């Protein structure tokens, strides 16, 4: 019972936050339609997760979160996807027209694979964007490895994402 109340409270808070956080075309370098395309693209490639550490459309469970893939609805999964995507957009907001592309990539590989950490340097992709170099196709596509191996389906996903969301 307590868990249901917490989940309901979280959903109410998230929906209020999402309503305020929904991209407005006037102050962001992309449209609502593009944002919805990103959501649809991620849903298509991620599918519905029911693994131990991931739920919904690829939401990685954080410490203290207790979502269950068995009881989660599609609407709850959609909400988590949008919140995660908005969090990524906030992290990459200073990259302007590239924020959407970087956010889509970060949803799959994690933001710090791109931004770097104290132990990991910034990605070559991000360094090129910061220098104004628009020739980033190969660097974007290079994020197609899993356990050191290139995965054709991930490479295809990167190509689709790049074609849909790269702004010249």
Q: What residue ranges belong to the model's regions?
A:
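Long, amphipathic alpha-helical surface segments
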Residues: 20-51, 59-66, 72-94, 112-168
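Short N-proximal segments of mature Sec-exported proteins
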Residues: 99-113
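Sec-dependent signal peptide recognition
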Residues: 4-10
């Amino acid at each position: 019972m307590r868990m249901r109340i917490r989940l309901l409270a979280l959903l109410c808070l998230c929906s209020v936050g999402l309503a305020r956080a929904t991209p407005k075309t006037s102050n962001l370098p992309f449209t609502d339609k593009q944002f919805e395309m990103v959501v649809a693209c991620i849903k298509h490639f991620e599918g519905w997760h029911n693994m131990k550490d991931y739920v919904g459309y690829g939401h990685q469970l954080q410490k203290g979160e207790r979502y269950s893939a068995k009881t989660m609805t599609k609407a709850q999964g959609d909400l988590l996807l949008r919140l995660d995507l908005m969090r990524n957009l906030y992290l990459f907001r200073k990259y302007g027209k590239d924020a959407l592309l970087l956010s889509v990539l970060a949803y799959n590989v994690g933001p710090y694979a791109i931004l770097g950490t104290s132990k990991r340097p910034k990605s070559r992709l991000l360094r090129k964007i910061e220098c104004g170099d628009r020739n980033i196709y190969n660097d974007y596509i290079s994020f197609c490895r899993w356990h050191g191996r290139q995965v054709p389906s991930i490479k295809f996903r990167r190509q689709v994402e790049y074609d849909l969301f790269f702004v010249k």
